[in-house]
Amino acid sequence: MSRPAGAVLSDRDERDWNLSAKDGWFAMVDTEPRPRPPRRSRAEIAAMPRIDRLRYNEARARWHANLGPIATPGMDSVFEQLEEICGSNRQDGEKVKPAAVLDALPGLGKTTAALAFARAFHREQIDLYGPTVPVEGGQWQRVPVVYLGLTSNTTIRSLNAMLCRFYALPAPDRGTATHLAHRAAECVAQCKTRLVVVDFTDRG
Protein backbone atom coordinates (compact mmCIF):
# COMPACT_ATOMS: atom_id res chain seq x y z
CA MET A 1 0.00 0.00 0.00
CA SER A 2 1.35 3.41 -0.95
CA ARG A 3 1.97 5.88 1.87
CA PRO A 4 2.86 9.17 0.21
CA ALA A 5 2.41 11.19 3.41
CA GLY A 6 3.67 8.59 5.88
CA ALA A 7 6.98 10.37 6.43
CA VAL A 8 5.48 13.83 6.91
CA LEU A 9 4.90 13.39 10.66
CA SER A 10 7.11 11.85 13.30
CA ASP A 11 7.05 11.25 17.03
CA ARG A 12 9.38 14.24 17.44
CA ASP A 13 7.14 16.64 15.54
CA GLU A 14 5.80 18.29 18.68
CA ARG A 15 7.78 21.42 19.46
CA ASP A 16 6.65 22.27 22.97
CA TRP A 17 9.76 24.20 23.95
CA ASN A 18 10.24 25.96 27.27
CA LEU A 19 12.05 29.06 26.06
CA SER A 20 12.75 30.17 29.64
CA ALA A 21 15.19 27.25 29.97
CA LYS A 22 18.51 27.02 28.16
CA ASP A 23 17.80 23.60 26.66
CA GLY A 24 14.43 24.75 25.33
CA TRP A 25 15.87 27.95 23.91
CA PHE A 26 18.68 26.12 22.13
CA ALA A 27 16.21 23.57 20.77
CA MET A 28 14.11 26.36 19.26
CA VAL A 29 17.12 28.17 17.82
CA ASP A 30 18.71 25.06 16.34
CA THR A 31 15.54 23.63 14.80
CA GLU A 32 14.86 24.51 11.19
CA PRO A 33 11.40 25.74 10.11
CA ARG A 34 8.84 23.06 9.42
CA PRO A 35 9.06 21.75 5.86
CA ARG A 36 6.12 22.53 3.63
CA PRO A 37 4.08 19.40 2.90
CA PRO A 38 4.07 18.37 -0.76
CA ARG A 39 1.23 19.80 -2.79
CA ARG A 40 -1.57 17.41 -3.62
CA SER A 41 -4.62 17.91 -5.79
CA ARG A 42 -8.11 17.34 -4.41
CA ALA A 43 -8.29 14.12 -6.35
CA GLU A 44 -4.97 12.92 -4.93
CA ILE A 45 -6.06 13.76 -1.38
CA ALA A 46 -9.38 12.02 -1.84
CA ALA A 47 -7.61 8.93 -3.19
CA MET A 48 -5.29 8.65 -0.18
CA PRO A 49 -5.87 5.88 2.35
CA ARG A 50 -7.57 7.30 5.43
CA ILE A 51 -4.47 7.24 7.67
CA ASP A 52 -2.36 8.96 5.02
CA ARG A 53 -5.01 11.62 4.53
CA LEU A 54 -5.13 12.24 8.29
CA ARG A 55 -1.35 12.58 8.43
CA TYR A 56 -1.26 14.84 5.41
CA ASN A 57 -3.99 17.14 6.72
CA GLU A 58 -2.32 17.27 10.13
CA ALA A 59 0.99 18.21 8.51
CA ARG A 60 -0.73 20.96 6.53
CA ALA A 61 -2.49 22.29 9.63
CA ARG A 62 0.77 22.42 11.60
CA TRP A 63 2.63 24.09 8.75
CA HIS A 64 -0.06 26.77 8.31
CA ALA A 65 -0.24 27.36 12.07
CA ASN A 66 3.50 28.07 12.18
CA LEU A 67 3.97 30.34 9.17
CA GLY A 68 6.13 33.37 9.68
CA PRO A 69 7.34 35.59 10.97
CA ILE A 70 6.34 37.59 7.92
CA ALA A 71 8.67 40.44 6.99
CA THR A 72 6.19 43.31 7.12
CA PRO A 73 7.39 46.94 6.97
CA GLY A 74 6.77 47.18 10.71
CA MET A 75 8.83 44.07 11.41
CA ASP A 76 11.65 45.31 9.17
CA SER A 77 11.68 48.62 11.03
CA VAL A 78 11.91 46.86 14.41
CA PHE A 79 14.76 44.68 13.16
CA GLU A 80 16.68 47.67 11.81
CA GLN A 81 16.45 49.52 15.12
CA LEU A 82 17.36 46.45 17.18
CA GLU A 83 20.31 45.70 14.91
CA GLU A 84 21.51 49.28 15.32
CA ILE A 85 21.31 49.05 19.12
CA CYS A 86 22.93 45.61 19.36
CA GLY A 87 25.49 46.45 16.70
CA SER A 88 26.72 49.44 18.68
CA ASN A 89 26.38 47.66 22.02
CA ARG A 90 30.07 46.87 22.44
CA GLN A 91 30.82 48.87 25.55
CA ASP A 92 33.21 47.41 28.08
CA GLY A 93 31.82 45.90 31.25
CA GLU A 94 31.98 49.01 33.42
CA LYS A 95 29.88 51.05 30.98
CA VAL A 96 26.11 51.15 30.81
CA LYS A 97 24.73 49.44 27.72
CA PRO A 98 21.61 50.66 25.92
CA ALA A 99 18.37 48.72 25.89
CA ALA A 100 15.29 48.57 23.69
CA VAL A 101 11.62 48.36 24.61
CA LEU A 102 8.94 47.02 22.26
CA ASP A 103 5.61 48.50 23.30
CA ALA A 104 2.31 47.91 21.54
CA LEU A 105 -1.21 46.64 22.11
CA PRO A 106 -1.64 42.90 22.72
CA GLY A 107 -1.61 40.68 19.65
CA LEU A 108 0.45 42.96 17.40
CA GLY A 109 3.55 40.77 17.36
CA LYS A 110 5.89 42.09 20.05
CA THR A 111 6.90 38.62 21.20
CA THR A 112 7.07 37.32 17.64
CA ALA A 113 9.41 40.13 16.61
CA ALA A 114 11.58 39.79 19.71
CA LEU A 115 11.94 36.03 19.32
CA ALA A 116 12.73 36.26 15.61
CA PHE A 117 15.43 38.85 16.23
CA ALA A 118 16.87 36.98 19.21
CA ARG A 119 17.01 33.72 17.25
CA ALA A 120 18.91 35.37 14.39
CA PHE A 121 21.23 37.16 16.85
CA HIS A 122 21.95 33.88 18.67
CA ARG A 123 22.87 32.10 15.45
CA GLU A 124 25.07 34.98 14.33
CA GLN A 125 27.01 34.96 17.60
CA ILE A 126 27.59 31.20 17.36
CA ASP A 127 28.75 31.57 13.76
CA LEU A 128 31.15 34.37 14.75
CA TYR A 129 32.63 32.96 17.94
CA GLY A 130 31.79 29.26 18.07
CA PRO A 131 29.62 27.23 20.46
CA THR A 132 32.01 27.24 23.42
CA VAL A 133 33.99 29.75 25.48
CA PRO A 134 37.51 28.61 26.45
CA VAL A 135 38.38 29.11 30.11
CA GLU A 136 41.23 27.96 32.29
CA GLY A 137 40.87 24.24 32.80
CA GLY A 138 38.04 23.70 30.35
CA GLN A 139 35.29 25.52 28.52
CA TRP A 140 31.82 27.01 28.99
CA GLN A 141 28.91 26.70 26.63
CA ARG A 142 28.33 29.95 24.77
CA VAL A 143 24.83 31.24 25.50
CA PRO A 144 24.40 34.39 23.41
CA VAL A 145 20.75 34.98 24.35
CA VAL A 146 18.63 34.55 27.47
CA TYR A 147 14.83 34.61 27.30
CA LEU A 148 12.70 35.33 30.37
CA GLY A 149 8.92 35.47 30.60
CA LEU A 150 7.84 37.89 33.34
CA THR A 151 4.52 38.84 34.92
CA SER A 152 3.43 41.70 37.17
CA ASN A 153 4.14 39.44 40.17
CA THR A 154 7.84 39.07 39.36
CA THR A 155 10.18 40.35 42.08
CA ILE A 156 13.91 41.06 41.94
CA ARG A 157 14.59 37.79 43.72
CA SER A 158 12.33 35.74 41.44
CA LEU A 159 13.88 37.45 38.39
CA ASN A 160 17.35 36.42 39.53
CA ALA A 161 16.06 32.92 40.24
CA MET A 162 14.65 32.75 36.71
CA LEU A 163 18.05 33.68 35.32
CA CYS A 164 19.68 30.92 37.38
CA ARG A 165 16.99 28.48 36.24
CA PHE A 166 17.56 29.42 32.59
CA TYR A 167 21.23 28.51 32.89
CA ALA A 168 20.24 25.23 34.60
CA LEU A 169 22.15 26.06 37.77
CA PRO A 170 21.58 23.72 40.73
CA ALA A 171 19.19 24.96 43.43
CA PRO A 172 18.14 28.03 41.42
CA ASP A 173 15.68 29.21 44.08
CA ARG A 174 17.97 29.04 47.10
CA GLY A 175 19.58 32.14 48.49
CA THR A 176 18.89 35.83 48.77
CA ALA A 177 18.23 38.10 45.81
CA THR A 178 21.82 39.32 46.00
CA HIS A 179 23.25 35.80 46.11
CA LEU A 180 21.14 34.71 43.14
CA ALA A 181 22.14 37.86 41.26
CA HIS A 182 25.83 37.07 41.73
CA ARG A 183 25.31 33.51 40.45
CA ALA A 184 23.37 34.74 37.42
CA ALA A 185 25.91 37.48 36.68
CA GLU A 186 28.72 34.94 36.64
CA CYS A 187 26.86 32.89 34.04
CA VAL A 188 26.13 35.97 31.94
CA ALA A 189 29.82 36.84 31.94
CA GLN A 190 31.27 33.35 31.50
CA CYS A 191 28.76 32.23 28.85
CA LYS A 192 29.19 35.51 26.92
CA THR A 193 25.50 36.32 26.99
CA ARG A 194 25.00 39.43 24.88
CA LEU A 195 21.21 39.75 24.74
CA VAL A 196 18.55 39.25 27.41
CA VAL A 197 14.95 39.23 26.18
CA VAL A 198 12.48 40.09 28.92
CA ASP A 199 8.96 39.27 27.74
CA PHE A 200 6.55 40.99 30.12
CA THR A 201 2.94 39.85 30.18
CA ASP A 202 0.58 41.54 32.61
CA ARG A 203 -2.38 39.25 33.02
CA GLY A 204 -3.62 40.91 36.18
Per-range role (PLM):
Residues 103-108, 152-153, 202-203:
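Short, internal active-site loops enriched in acidic
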